[in-house]
Amino acid sequence: MKQLHFITKLLDIKDPNIQILDIINKDTHKEIIAKLDYDAPSCPECGSQMKKYDFQKPSKIPYLETTGMPSRILLRKRRFKCYHCSKMMVAETPLVKKNHQIPRIINQKIAQKLIEKISMTDIAHQLAISTSTVIRKLNDFHFEHDFSRLPKIMSWDEYAFT
């Protein structure tokens, strides 16, 4: 039977390698159980063909609200093993950066809400993430200061002549 990708389109997940297996409605949130699987790549170390090994423990990835409830994706990623050099590798997806658990769409939403006048705790509560994640994202911003010229008006609080 051909798989229809209604749920992945609804959640705006563009990776065709992510298969949604089940959706569980909890009292406080929705859990989307999915797996990331694709053909084994060649080994980055020795270049020989890797083989499918097993799946990782599910990553708990927070995601945007669906139907007014916070949701998270329990993503099981495929692991690959090179039997020539014993190198292990985990499947990657554009949904999240390598070795991260916060998806790119949540990072974009954090940046969007930081521009608005909303407190960090409210942002964290709305997106179902921790406040420290919002603070880390704020610290990622780089503000450019123009020190090439002085302002027209300058003032000092205290001064002393010695």
Labelled PLM ranges:
Residues 60-162:
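Short, positively charged, Gly/Tyr-enriched micro-motifs
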Residues 1-87, 93:
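Short, conserved DNA-binding cores of transcription-related domains
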